[in-house]
Amino acid sequence: MGIYQLCYLKMHSGMLFLAGHTEDKEKETLLKALSDVMDTARKAMAGKSFARSPYRAPIAALAAGAAAALAYLEQGEREKMREEILTALNAAAK
């Protein structure tokens, strides 16, 4: 299993956690999970061969969804946050 596949799986599992717990977890827990997803994306995108990776598009989709979800979380709009997460998961699956 390659490094980018591991990054994708870590990000995907974090986003699944977020999708299932947007309403019942404290804001700090959600911020930590989003931070983990974003940090993993940052590390993956800094890799030398990221541009040639087949996981480039899914990682970018999850990173964009996490960034949008963070903005909605900061505004207190958890339902929109969940929608962004689900949209990103759907885009990453294609």
Task: Outline where the language-model segments fall.
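Tandem-repeat/low-complexity and Cys-motif detector
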Residues: 1, 57-59
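Short terminal alpha-helical segments
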Residues: 1-35, 89-93
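Generic L/I/V-rich hydrophobic alpha-helical segments across diverse proteins
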Residues: 8-11, 15, 34, 38-41, ...
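Charged, low-complexity interaction regions
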Residues: 20-28, 46-56, 71-80
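Short stretches within intrinsically disordered, low-complexity N-terminal or propeptide regions
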Residues: 21, 35, 43-46, 53, ...
